[in-house]
Regions:
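Extended charged low-complexity segments that act as oligomerization/scaffolding linkers
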Residues: 85-88, 145
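A short coil-to-beta-strand element that immediately follows conserved catalytic motifs
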Residues: 90-97, 155-156
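Short hydrophobic core segments
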Residues: 1-7, 114-119
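FAD-binding beta-loop-beta segment adjacent to the flavin cofactor pocket
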Residues: 97-117, 122
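A short, flexible beta-alpha/helix-coil linker loop
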Residues: 62, 121-124
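Active-site-proximal substrate-binding core of FAD-dependent oxidoreductases
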Residues: 141-176
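A conserved FAD-binding loop/helix module that cradles the flavin
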Residues: 123-143
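Predominantly flavin-linked oxidoreductase catalytic cores and closely associated redox partners
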Residues: 2-84, 139
Length: 176
């Protein structure tokens, strides 16, 4: 079974524990859009006093958000920060959503015949690209083992858990 039940962790929750990444102090994010024709072919991340802002340009708008620690900044203050940030560029930011989160990962990604993937497995930061990358690496690791060994057992669960723990720790270090 592949548990893709998000933060609920419906299958894997009783089989292993979730470890919070204590070094990742950011625990909240807000995001929205800016109407603007941008030609940057990449996502930009910019450090701020209380976190960081991302800008992902698409045709006709920029998806943008602010990741921060709510110990130091309220949601209202974060929204005001975003409005001021974009106003300084002559643009208007429209808030869409806000979320609180806990960065961390499961102690074991695979236990017996249950494999966790997606938000069920880990959460490092709210940029979708990080989560998509983790999902793809997990699927690739699983498929390589199944194609090689033609079975799934304790050995394969241990290998995937070890590979993903290393990958997730390296990804978390990169984000720091």
């Amino acid at each position: 079974y592949i548990d893709c039940s998000g933060f609920k962790r419906l299958l894997i929750n009783k089989l292993t524990s979730f470890n919070k990444y204590e070094r990742l102090i950011n625990n909240a994010a807000i995001w929205g859009t800016v109407k603007h024709q941008s030609y940057k072919p990449c996502t930009v991340a910019a450090a701020q006093d209380y976190g960081w802002i991302w800008e992902t340009p698409t045709w006709g708008r920029i998806g943008t958000g602010f990741v921060y620690c709510d110990d130091f900044l309220s949601v209202d203050d974060a929204e005001n920060h975003m409005k001021k940030h974009w106003r300084s560029k002559g643009l208007e930011w429209k808030a869409d959503k806000s979320v609180k989160f806990t960065g961390g990962s499961l102690d074991r990604v695979a236990v017996k015949n249950v494999i966790a993937n997606g938000l069920c497995q880990s959460f490092i930061e709210p940029l979708e690209s990080t989560s998509i990358m983790v999902i793809c690496v997990t699927i690739k690791s699983i498929s390589k083992l199944i194609n090689k060994n033609k079975v799934w057992g304790k050995k394969e669960s241990n290998i995937v858990s070890k590979v993903m723990k290393k990958f997730l720790n390296e990804t978390m270090e990169f984000v720091l």
